Amino acid sequence: MKDLNPIFSDLASGSLYIAGPCSAESREQLLATALGVHNAGVQVFRAGVWKPRTRPGSFEGMGREALPWLREAKERYGLHVITEVATPEHIEQVLKAGLDGVWIGARTTTNPFAMQEIADALRGTDIAILVKNPVSPDVDLWSGAIERLYNSGIRRLAAVHRGFGTHQTTPYRNAPHWSVPIELHRRMPELPILSDPSHIGGRRELVQPLAQEALDLGFDGLMIECHAAPDKALSDARQQITPEALGELLHSLILRRTPVTQDALRDYRLHIDSLDSRLLELLAERMGVAREIGEYKRAHAMAVVQHDRFNELLLAAEAKAEKMGISKHFVHQIFSAIHEESVRQQVAVERDEIR
C-alpha cells in the first residue's frame, strides 16, 4: 500500500481529528454542532445519517433527508464532511450529495459480502474511506475489508479503531485490545490508523484518557463524538461531549512526536527481541512439563483438566502481577491462553497424538 494518498489532501500533515454527533437529528442540531466543531479547530465533521442499531425501535437516523444538512455544514464552515455507509445505495446518495468521505461501521466490516459490494460501488471514486474494526478482535477480517477497497482502486484509506465487543466485565463499552490495531499497523505500515475513544469508552469521562493513550501508542488521529446538547442526544448520549469540551480535550493532549535516535531505538528493539526469545524458550519448556504431566495423568487415569489447580494458579499470578504493576486483565488473558495450550497438549498425550 505504498501508493496511498493523503485522506484529505488539503489538510496539513500531523494528527487528524474528526468530530461530530453520533447522529444527524435535525438541521438546527447539526449546524450548531458543526459550528462548535469548527470553533474547536477540527476540520473534519462526522455525523451518522443511517444508524445500524443493535435492536429495532431505536433511533435509526434521518436517512437521506439529512444529507443536505451535511452539505450545508460543509459550505458554511469550510469543513470536510463524512457519514457512515452500509450499502451501495447509501454510497450513491452520498456521492450525489457531494460529501467528502464515508466511514464503514463495525457491523459492516464484519461481513465480507457487504464489504465487496461496497468496494465495487466505490470503484472509480476518489473520496476518503475510513474502515472501522470489526465487532470481534479479528485482524484478518479488518485487513481483508481494507484490502477489498484497495483492490477496487481506493487510495484515500484509513482505519478506525473503535474497540471490540466482549462478554467480559470491563470499564469500557468496547474492549480496546490495543494489540489488534498494533498488529494491523505492522501489516500495513503506510495505512493511517485513528482511534475512536468515544465508542471504546462509552462514557464521556473516559474519552480524554483513552484519546491520550491512543496518541501515546502512535495512532495517527482521533474520531470523537461531539454534540451541541449531548444529554438530549437521540443516540449514544453518554459518550458524546460538547464542542467546548472537545476544544479543551484537544488542548490537553500531549503529542509525543520527539523521535528517539535510531541507535537508541535499535538497542531497545534488540533488547525486546532477546526478551521475546527467552519468553518462547520458557513457554516451550513449560509445555514440555505439561506433556509430562499429561503422561502422568494418563498413567493414573486422571482427568486432564483440574479446575481448582488452574484457579489457584490464576489467582496467585494476578496477585503477583498487581504488585509488579502489571494489569490483572492482561495476566488473566495470558495465563488463560497458556492453560488452553497446556490442556491441548495433554489431551494430545491422552490420544497418543502429540507431535
Q: Over which residues does each language-model region extend?
A:
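Catalytic alpha/beta core domains of metabolic enzymes, predominantly
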Residues: 10, 114-248, 252, 257-261
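Long, contiguous binding/interaction regions
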Residues: 25, 34, 38, 43, ...
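Glycine-rich, proline-tolerant flexible connector loops at the mouths of alpha/beta enzymes
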Residues: 46-65, 228-237, 293-302
